[in-house]
């Protein structure tokens, strides 16, 4: 959010200044949605899957298991009808959302025990939000929701057995390698997590058009810049984690991934039947995913296969 604030101030020649507060400074970590909705704060920055209790469909606009990658969700939101649906479901809460950052496909996370089979998932206490947490629970694990600032201590002291966070670039900074030995992939639970800038609709409507355009433009630029940064930095950070800090990089067993996939598909399908709004978002999301997956077979997928030979 600091980048958005800086860019908005620069583009508006100082006409608009946004004061950014860190998580917990003025609002609890998971209280951003309510703060913006009520108008106590004009803006907020977070991830939609934290509001699943209020707006279950919001999870599709962050990331869902085995869903859209960063490029794909950008395309769905900006050119595939996703943004219109997003704003439709947030409007009753007096919130105007804008895509505001994506860190790309995540790692599954940090573990203090090996995952060699589905039996190792049973009883596993893991910090994992959103539908990913529901999948873990269905597989026998124990999902825990904790804010980022509490994760290192929780992992180090054994309050949790594992945590997902972002990817090597972020995780190295957080020092998770000092609290857990095993680093698992792939990040099936968050293939393209989109963050959101939440704006109180009354505050938004009070702005002149040129400032609205500046905010939209600045946020769109930061959304892409964030993805570029993580793509450029992740492998360098991963190399350091392995070669300097002795982290053991592990791939989840195929049968574990497949079980997670089957459970994920059922949970998403069941969720889509809960009400008309969720069903509409689900149908749009899945149709876009199916279409882009077909095209990838003759574009990115086939090219990457050819390049890597």
Regions found by a protein language model. Give the residues of each.
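General nucleic-acid-binding
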Residues: 76
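N-terminal secretory/targeting leader peptides
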Residues: 1-73, 83-309
